[in-house]
Amino acid sequence: MSRGPEEVNRLTENTYRNVMEQFNPGLRNLINLGKNYEKAVNAMILAGKAYYDGVAKIGEIATGSPVSTELGHVLIEISSTHKKLNETLDENFKKFHKDIIHELEKKTELDVKYMNATLKRYQAEHRNKLDSLEKSQAELKKIRRKSQGGRNALKYEHKEIEYVETVTSRQSEIQKFIADGCKEALLEEKRRFCFLVDKHCSFASHIHYYHMQSAELLNSKLPRWQETCCDATKVPEKIMNMIEEIKTPISTPVSGTPQPSPMIERSKMIGKDYDTLSKYSPKMPPAPSVKAYTSPLIDMFNNPATAAQSSEKTNNSTANTGEDPSLQRSVSVATGLNMMKKQKVKTIFPHTAGNNKTLLSFAQGDVLTLLIPEEKDGWLYGEHDTTKARGWFPSSYTKLLEENEAMSVPTPSPAPVRSISTVDLTEKSSVVIPPPDYLECLSMGATSDKKAGAPKVPSASTFRAPVSRPDATSTSPSDANGTAKPPFLSGENPFATVKLRPTVTNDRSAPIIR
């Protein structure tokens, strides 16, 4: 595409103007954007450093876990790797500032002055050449007018030829000047774009090297990192062995473990040195399913009829409420014994196990050590201090061992063994047994109560002890003493259920009491 000198001249001037009015201002804007880019990258590096410091802290937490130790080490390694990559990125952006931002700032200020001067010089030289050409053309016109109308035509003809050559020469010069000026302007523009591209290529080379290093580093570590987290349900073999040991312990608690007394928590706060169930559970048989035998002297002050009524009411209350009888009995036991730091008991009646291997045999006055502090349906589990035999025995056949009787300092026992009132009755050597006439009176009263519709007194087999106590009369203890749970065991008045019957004295001088 051919262009005239004027069009090429306009192209040259426009090229210079584009560099001054668009390229250089664009460089200034690029410098500002580059500085913002630097700030953003530096902020990103600082934020990344803080972030991966947090990752490392979480990794340290994971190293303390028995199943996540390896994952914790991986998190720490990921943190250190990314911080190293961020440090390398920071070094590359220092080169970005040095090679691009700094150079552009320096070149832009100088180039504005240079391009302005170059354009002015080109325009001035171009104007001078045009002026010379125009003068030569004007002289040529004058010569031609003179040669056409003058007498010395040959003389003017020779001068005309000289001016034509001068105009032609000056036209060639100005065309050459315009062409060279256009070429120079375009090259100046290209040099500036080349400079910008070259600087960014240099920075891109640094970034490429950074990414190559990062890729090589990550490719060497990433598969191992992924392997540690591929299965979240995998548990180390050591931990699995520990879990299996927990699932299948050496011993399991006995299914017939007595229910704890409501006072057990209070007792635990007072004494912590009694034996626990788990210590003896492997050798402990289940508690007997039948209710424990009742002490022969437990109901000696109760009227049989009223005792039967009281027993029936108690049983009905237990059935209605649906509570555990052992829990009710534990509540009814005197609280003073719960608070005593005892673990040994003394037998007040003999007991024979017979063919039942789960029961414990002992004689009167033997010392037993409680292995289970709680009571189950009137049964306690303990060890004979002399024979070292273990088994279940009725709690009513024992009493707490007094401090002056113990050989060593007793340990706390939260078990409600028996009411103090019962222990006092059985501990005294001189127990007053009602005379036969009193028994007959009781029998008559019981017979009259039966006729009146009173509840039937439990049979002797229900409350008879396995072994008859010494010095016992022919009358059955259970027939004389009534039910197994007298009211005075719950802390009430022991004579609250005793009724005064009409009595006639043999002394005629005494008044008749009705």
UniProtKB/Swiss-Prot annotation:
The modification Phosphothreonine is found at residues 248, 257, 411. Keywords: Actin-binding, Coiled coil, Cytoplasm, Cytoskeleton, Phosphoprotein, SH3 domain. The keyword Phosphoprotein applies. The IMD domain is predicted to have a helical structure. It may induce actin bundling and filopodia formation. Pfam families: IMD, SH3_9. Residues 306-329, 449-514 are annotated as: Disordered. SMART domains: SH3. May function as adapter protein. Involved in the formation of clusters of actin bundles. Plays a role in the reorganization of the actin cytoskeleton in response to bacterial infection. This is BAR/IMD domain-containing adapter protein 2-like 1. Phosphorylated on tyrosine in response to insulin. Residues 340-403 form the SH3 domain. The gene is Baiap2l1. Signal peptide: none annotated. Interacts with RAC1. Binds to F-actin. Interacts with FASLG. GO terms for biological process: plasma membrane organization; positive regulation of actin filament polymerization; regulation of actin cytoskeleton organization. It comes from Mus musculus. It is found in: Cytoplasm, Cytoskeleton. It comes from the Eukaryota.
